[in-house]
Amino acid sequence: MAPSSIHVVFPFITLAGLYAVSNLMINSGHAQLFTDRRASATPLLPDNKTPLLTVYTGVPPLDSYLANLQFSIIPTVDGSSQALALLGWHWMGLLIAVFTVMLVESLRTRRARDLIPFALWGLAIQYAGYFIIMPIYCYVSLLSQSPRKHSRLPTMAAIKVIPASVLIGLVIPSAIMCLPSNRLSGQSRQVAVAVWQNFPAWMALVQVIAVSLVGAIPARKSEERTTEDGELSRNMSALRRLYKATAVVSALIHVLGLIPIVSAAIGKLEPTQDSPHAQLRPADFFLPQKWDTETQVSGMREGAFNFLRYDYYIGTAAAFAWVIFFQPSMRVKGDTWSIGREVSWNIALTCLFGPGFTIVSLMERRLE
């Protein structure tokens, strides 16, 4: 049974996130910049050269959203802003971890149709915002968990193909939209961003196809004779390996992403006020503009840099709380010291190896 505190934690994160982000967008002038750009007779991307592509699917509301999306994502992936590119790198480490964990959770029922909710939740995160949907997903996930579902593991075939689903559905579309300008035109990059936006659907689709292909391969005789306990043991070992590999990849991305920040902090990148490296200083990189500050952003790039950090922090706070509530110590009433010590330790791990590493590591501990 889920702790009663989840009824406070996740609604609070959701409402606080909505309040902070909406005030940030208004007070910083970012929302007005959006309005002015779209109202232009010939809307341009933040580089002020590339025309905004406004038709993608032929569905006006969806096309309008995808066009608005370009103002935040294009400067993150086109290499025009060092700080945004580095933030995008950190986002990749987080997305790999979070969506791997979400995919595993959807596969516990062993019903292919449960990949539909995974895809829908993922698309909701992409279209409505990580900071809004992730707290709601975590809340619903904890409310809907049952002891029987906790004990179930995905099939061996499903576990084996998860890396392919992440690679083909998420990593490859991400890499394509980040190709240099001499390989990808401004218009093509906008199409690539629109394709990437739907990566949860591509992950689910690859998972279904790959599992069906793996299932068509005849099992070895030794596997056919495996008992139920033996199958559980094999699947748990495979899931542990998946979690460990995902945690290592996420941690590696985070640690590599810290190198420019540390270099800026110790003066290796000469981060003077007018230098392009100025935003890589730890305080400038990690701390966005406060939501109630009326300092106007200088352009769409700065606005995107602020928004994407709020999005990252708020959604990840929910994911962090989610996996903490799954831990055995949370099921022991009055075990406040153990909970506090666990949270402190995991905050330290997050600073060193990134939130993706911590989230996946905690989900692995849940198997104990």
Language-model-detected regions and their locations in the chain:
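Long, hydrophobic alpha-helical transmembrane bundles and adjoining juxtamembrane helices/loops
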Residues: 1-368
